[in-house]
Regions:
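Outer-membrane beta-barrel proteins
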Residues: 1-176
Length: 176
């Protein structure tokens, strides 16, 4: 949001079987000439455990303003051990209005993230996150061949979360 505040929210439902669905929305602003004003994501997946390892597989669809013409979807797989988790997302499909010579297809971008989360004795959850987004589709969206890195610290209690987050994206393009 160009160093401005964002209002975000989401709703999730998880069944005892491990299947889940959810939605998330935020205002967005990517700078001068930006046609985006909001992002609305929907996702569905299946979470399960094998021994001490937790798994998560699913699909995530990113929906932007109709003027933006940059909607896309990803498939993902995540694995957790103890307080740590790692997730890999891969571009599955796009409805992006591609420029001349661009043809984004399956696997044209990826997102790799590492997370750590722990609950303190007072019931407050603390989370640390770092992720990296790269690939041809990411380059077109961010304007930089080296992709971008995002990171955050979060605090949660009783269903509410406060998060401080940032990226290495400066001035409309990721710094190398």
């Amino acid at each position: 949001t160009e160093n401005e505040s964002a209002v975000q929210g989401g709703i999730d439902y998880a069944a005892d079987s491990g299947f889940y669905v959810g939605t998330w929305a935020s205002n967005v602003n990517y700078g001068a000439g930006d046609v985006y004003s909001y992002e609305h994501d929907v996702y569905a997946g299946y979470a399960f455990s094998t021994g001490d390892i937790s798994w998560d597989v699913g699909y995530l669809y990113y929906n932007y303003d109709s003027e933006a013409e940059f909607d896309f979807g990803e498939v993902y797989v995540g694995m957790g051990i103890g307080d740590f988790s790692v997730q890999y997302n891969l571009l599955a499909n796009t409805e992006a209005d591609e420029a001349e010579g661009q043809d984004f297809g399956f696997g044209e971008a990826y997102y790799l993230s590492l997370d750590y989360g722990v609950e303190l004795s007072n019931g407050v959850g603390v989370g640390l996150h770092i992720g990296h987004h790269d690939g041809d589709f990411a380059e077109a969206f961010n304007g930089n061949a080296s992709g971008y890195t995002d990171y955050n610290v979060s605090f949660s209690k009783d269903g509410f979360t406060f998060m401080i987050s940032d990226t290495n994206v400066k001035g409309g393009a990721a710094e190398g």
